[in-house]
From Swiss-Prot:
GO biological process, one term: barbed-end actin filament capping
Gene name in the database record: AIM3-1
GO cellular component: actin cortical patch; membrane raft
Protein name: Altered inheritance of mitochondria protein 3-1
Localization (cell): Membrane raft
Low complexity bias locations: 120-142, 263-318, 434-447
Native organism: Candida glabrata (strain ATCC 2001 / BCRC 20586 / JCM 3761 / NBRC 0622 / NRRL Y-65 / CBS 138) (Yeast)
Membrane topology, as annotated: Peripheral membrane protein
Length: 661
């Protein structure tokens, strides 16, 4: 452990070398631990691990000891990265200049750079920032100018106004003070920052634009009227606005000159509005001291509680260049419109770290609103959302589909077999489950003619007869396919039990004995076709076992042909008898099956003869049972007459052989 500790100690100093030592030390200590585990119990290991974990976690606690207020605030927007450094120097009373500057506007700390330089003018600045400069109408303002430079020139209040028309100082105050104050504030800063005349000139230009905008707003009586309501000195402010009109109309030079004569104008303002300034100073000082522990210009609750959050607004707006915050030609209040309550109140704070200074809000009136503004809450109306699905909803889709199926079945009862087949397919697709072999009542018409390649002659005839005899059965084809292993495209292993198909109160399946009579007619072609009846399959199995055990010689082909013909004749006769007894019109299906019989007999007979003569040599072993079948079939037929259908066969032994042939 000592080596580990030393390695950790050196890791920070030597970087790569230190990490190497740590790795080596860890490797060596792990070796020791491995050897100790063999001898000792795990107590020592746990003890050492605990020590190591303690040492390892202790440095993390050091981070908790640091005061986050010691760090400068991160830049809130991309354009302000340069300003952060200045903010740290100018931060007042431990407030980050970036944060305090909303209040910093009162502090004359320039909206971007809170500079101590502005502080001597803090009292006039506090008075002055009341004039919200309408968002600098960018007509004269150059976006390229650095805010870091310009705004330090402007007292914070003016900068807040200048950078953001958003910051809406109390309505009456703002317009008038704006017209004069931008000059005064610039003047105050200029006098203080006389070393920056050029920059001041640059700043003056935006003031002109702001003044022009402001004058426009003043021309709109709505803006000035609100100001009048708010302040007694409105008329003076209007006069000042008219004065500013001269300035604003004048070229930059005039304003610059005015800026260099800051004190007299500021004094004029103070004289013109002594009441307002005194109230602002007192209220602002109280609020600033309470909330921020600083004197920062906060718009007094008395004058306009609405705009108490202007400091907040300034905090939003000061942190970003004015162009970003507002499009030009949008005065903070909208041109000629009474300032909305807390225009910036609903903007989310971008990325300002939480600070006690910010949570403390300037006025009790806007405290709740300000908190809501600073903490963006995404309120989701859960009532608008649909209720979550429950287990009860699981079967609803299938239940609805069942009703659909019943409707389709009733409609299909009058439709021919081809349309019924398509409807049956549609029903199955709707349910997304394999169609049961037996359907609900009224589905007898669903019986689909068996696919020609899958059905032997006797089977197709028998299925037709059975379908008409039992009106409640969904489709005998499905039942036969079930026994064949071709049920609904599923493999033999996936077949659903046929008992499920009898659930809906349908009449029971017809006794299989009648079909066994028909199907058990020794039809030698059936074993060859890939799909075959169950009885024939059992016969084939029995013959396979008997033939393989005795290895009897194969019968001659002519005997087999005779048997084939005889068996076919018998099966035809039986099927015709059954159909005549049922007296059911089976014309279309009967015609098709009769044609299929002839086609199938030829193809099956040819393939069978080829295999007998050994043309398919590889298949001889598999086909032996088939060859020996015809003589044995009649015996098995008698034994199977009265018996119930045997269980479903799981394998089709002869199917693979015919794939090759």
């Amino acid at each position: 452990m000592d080596s580990l500790k030393s390695g950790l100690a050196t890791a920070g100093k030597f970087t790569y070398k230190g990490t190497k030592t740590v790795a080596k030390a860890g490797y060596n200590t792990s070796k020791k631990h491995m050897h100790k585990k063999d001898k000792d119990t795990h107590h020592t290991d746990h003890h050492e691990e605990d020590e190591y974990s303690e040492d390892y976690h202790t440095p993390r606690s050091v981070n908790t000891l640091r005061d986050p207020s010691s760090f400068p605030p991160p830049p809130t927007r991309s354009g302000q990265a340069g300003h952060v450094a200045g903010n740290t120097a100018g931060s007042i009373a431990g407030n980050y200049s970036g944060y305090s500057q909303p209040t910093a506007a009162a502090n004359n700390t320039i909206s971007y750079n809170a500079q101590a330089q502005n502080t001597p003018y803090s009292s006039p600045a506090q008075q002055q920032p009341v004039s919200p400069q309408p968002p600098v109408q960018n007509s004269q303002y150059n976006p390229t100018q650095n805010y870091a430079i310009q705004q330090p020139q402007q007292p914070a209040g003016t900068n807040a106004n200048y950078s953001y028309g958003n910051q809406q100082h109390p309505a009456g105050q703002a317009p008038i003070v704006n017209s004069i104050t931008p000059n005064h504030q610039y003047n105050a800063n200029n006098t203080f920052q006389s070393n920056l005349p050029n920059q001041q000139l640059n700043v003056a230009a935006p003031t002109q634009s702001t003044n022009n905008n402001f004058n426009q707003m003043a021309a709109n009586n709505t803006y000035t009227n609100s100001a009048q309501v708010a302040y007694n000195s409105q008329q003076q402010q209007l006069q000042q606005n008219s004065q500013q009109n001269t300035y604003s109309n004048a070229p930059y030079q005039v304003q610059a000159q005015a800026a260099y004569n800051p004190l007299p104008q500021q004094q004029q303002q103070q004289q013109q509005q002594p009441e307002y300034n005194t109230q602002l100073q007192q209220n602002q000082q109280l609020h600033n001291q309470q909330a921020y522990g600083q004197q920062q210009q906060i718009y007094s609750n008395n004058t306009q509680p609405q705009y108490v959050s202007q400091t907040q607004q300034t905090s939003y707006t000061q942190n970003a260049p004015p162009q970003q915050t507002r499009s030009p030609e949008q005065p903070v209040y909208g041109q000629g419109i009474t300032p909305p309550v807390q225009a910036n109140a609903y903007r989310p704070m971008p990325s300002i770290p939480p600070d006690v200074n910010q949570t403390a809000i300037t006025s009790t009136n806007s405290a709740n609103e300000a908190l809501q503004n600073r903490i963006p809450m995404n309120n989701v109306d859960l009532s608008s959302l649909p209720p979550p699905p429950t287990h009860r909803d699981r079967g609803r889709a299938s239940v609805e589909n069942e009703t659909i199926d019943e409707n389709m079945q009733t409609n299909n009862s009058t439709i021919d077999s081809s349309s019924v087949a398509s409807a049956d397919i549609n029903n199955n697709s709707i349910r997304n489950i394999p169609a049961p072999a037996v359907g609900p009542p009224g589905a007898a018409t669903r019986a689909v003619p068996p696919p020609p390649p899958r059905r032997t002659t006797s089977q197709s005839m028998s299925t037709n007869s059975v379908v008409e005899t039992s009106p409640g059965i969904n489709s005998i084809e499905q039942i036969n396919n079930y026994y064949d292993g071709t049920y609904a495209g599923h493999s033999a292993n996936e077949r659903p039990p046929i008992t499920n198909t009898l659930k809906r109160g349908t009449p029971p399946l017809p006794r299989r004995s009648t079909s066994t009579k028909m199907n058990t007619q020794p039809n030698p072609q059936t074993p060859i076709s890939p799909s075959r009846d169950t009885n024939m399959d059992l016969q084939r199995r029995s013959t396979v076992s008997s033939i393989q055990s005795s290895n009897r010689p194969m019968p001659d082909p002519p005997i087999r042909k005779d048997n084939i013909q005889e068996n076919n004749i018998e099966s035809k006769q039986v099927n015709q008898e059954v159909n005549s007894q049922m007296s059911v019109s089976n014309i279309g299906i009967g015609d098709i099956t009769s044609e299929l019989q002839h086609i199938k007999l030829k193809s099956v007979g040819n393939s069978y003869e080829r295999e007998i003569h050994g043309e398919a040599a590889t298949e001889v072993v598999h086909n032996k049972p088939l060859k020996k079948k015809p003589p044995t079939v009649p015996k098995k037929k008698d034994s199977l007459k009265g018996k119930a259908p045997p269980p479903v066969p799981k394998k089709k032994p002869t199917l693979t052989s015919f794939v090759h042939s």
